[in-house]
């Protein structure tokens, strides 16, 4: 994608999307996802879009956690919770998709409005609350998709109606339903929008959760030709460096395959030039203001683990340069979400093209 194409999205397409639903960000999200779901039903249309947008080059290929990825640029969880548009994401040049976060029980999420744009900072605030159709529904949809066009990771979280003391059983139910269809499974213990969820990052609670899931993983893997699935833990950017080190110790003790760093932040530090009423909205902040903290966390994890633990870097990646910086910081793969909102569907191609011109981040 050259500069003129980027400008066309920014000044031609984006203003139209931002006006949908009288400016309601979630309405624009829903309508865009509906269009992508329709595109996903047509193999010919997906093939045509893929021909125009996807860069296929062996130098982009990665094998991470034993999974072959056609390129390192993925779609972050939250964009397509119920996995309705996976073929379209593949056609747009993503190397993998993480669907979810999905919960055992279907749930509507928090009351609307719950998604807010901060265009001055190229950011979003969301308090969606894991709105999704449930693990069983996602499992049925993924079963129909097999074989998937690109690796599909599945992010699982706790149902809102499930008490924290029963969280392990809730995660296990989702895990067992989705195991057959997931390239990897991400354990989301870091969303700020489900009451009490972040407590599961505490060492003792995380240890118990991972032990239970790895028990199921080993059991299910014995009868599956692909064996156990890689388990990744998604952490919050708001953890202290000491807390991150404790999480890494627990993850190492329980055979976690990688870390996803990071989720959205509850901090509003450095958020300037925006409507104070928007900045005060409850929820997780994503986008441009998160990049510095996300890079710090990725560098910290890479240093503490001696670059031996795979990291999926996510948070504030809006440009090819952001993607390169994340890979240079130690990420094995990267994910985008808010950058897609502000810079358009050809962002994966721009990042992959940049990777090909920078030998430091080629495999």
Swiss-Prot record:
Cofactors named for this entry: FMN
GO biological processes: 'de novo' pyrimidine nucleobase biosynthetic process; 'de novo' UMP biosynthetic process; pyrimidine ribonucleotide biosynthetic process
Entry's Gene Ontology cellular component terms: cytoplasm; plasma membrane
Active site location: 191
Cofactor note (record): Binds 1 FMN per subunit.
Keywords: Cell membrane, Flavoprotein, FMN, Membrane, Oxidoreductase, Pyrimidine biosynthesis
Recorded metabolic or biological pathway in which this protein acts: Pyrimidine metabolism; UMP biosynthesis via de novo pathway; orotate from (S)-dihydroorotate (quinone route): step 1/1
Residues reported in the UniProt entry to bind FMN: 77-81, 101, 155, 188, 234, 262, 287, 316, 337-338
SUPFAM superfamilies hit by this protein: FMN-linked oxidoreductases (SSF51395)
Cell membrane listed as a keyword: yes
Gene3D superfamilies: Aldolase class I
UniProt function note: Catalyzes the conversion of dihydroorotate to orotate with quinone as electron acceptor.
Protein name according to UniProt: Dihydroorotate dehydrogenase (quinone)
Organism: Chloroflexus aurantiacus (strain ATCC 29366 / DSM 635 / J-10-fl)
């Amino acid at each position: 994608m050259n500069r003129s194409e980027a400008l066309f999205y920014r000044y031609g397409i984006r203003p139209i999307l931002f006006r949908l639903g009288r400016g309601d960000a979630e309405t624009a999200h829903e309508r865009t996802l509906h269009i992508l779901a329709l595109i996903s039903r047509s193999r010919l249309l997906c093939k045509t879009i893929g021909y125009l947008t996807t860069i296929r080059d062996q130098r982009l290929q990665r094998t991470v956690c034993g999974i072959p990825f056609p390129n390192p640029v993925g779609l972050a969880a939250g964009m397509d919770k119920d996995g309705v548009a996976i073929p379209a994401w593949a056609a747009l040049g993503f190397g993998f998709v993480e669907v979810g976060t999905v919960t055992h029980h279907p749930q509507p999420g928090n009351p609307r409005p719950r998604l807010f744009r901060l265009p001055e900072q190229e950011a979003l605030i969301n308090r969606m609350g894991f709105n999704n159709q449930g693990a069983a529904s996602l499992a049925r949809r993924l079963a129909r998709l097999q074989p998937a066009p690109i690796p599909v990771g599945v992010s699982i979280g706790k149902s809102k109606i499930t008490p924290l003391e029963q969280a392990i059983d809730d995660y296990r139910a989702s895990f067992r339903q989705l195991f057959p269809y997931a390239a990897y499974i991400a354990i989301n213990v870091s969303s700020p929008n489900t009451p009490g969820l972040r407590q599961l990052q505490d060492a003792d609670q995380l240890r118990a959760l991972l032990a239970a899931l790895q028990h199921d993983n080993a059991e299910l893997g014995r009868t599956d030709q692909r064996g156990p699935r890689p388990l990744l833990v998604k952490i919050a950017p708001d953890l202290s460096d000491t807390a991150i080190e404790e999480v890494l110790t627990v993850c190492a003790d329980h055979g976690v395959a990688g870390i996803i760093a990071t989720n959205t932040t509850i901090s509003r530090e450095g958020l300037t030039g925006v409507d104070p009423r928007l900045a005060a909205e409850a929820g997780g902040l994503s986008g441009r203001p998160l990049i510095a903290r996300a890079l710090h966390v990725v560098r910290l994890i890479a240093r503490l683990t001696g670059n031996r633990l795979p990291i999926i870097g996510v948070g504030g990646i809006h440009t090819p340069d952001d993607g390169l910086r994340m890979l240079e910081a130690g990420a094995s793969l990267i994910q985008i979400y808010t950058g897609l909102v502000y810079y358009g569907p050809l962002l994966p191609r721009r990042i992959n093209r940049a990777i090909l011109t920078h030998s430091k981040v080629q495999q």
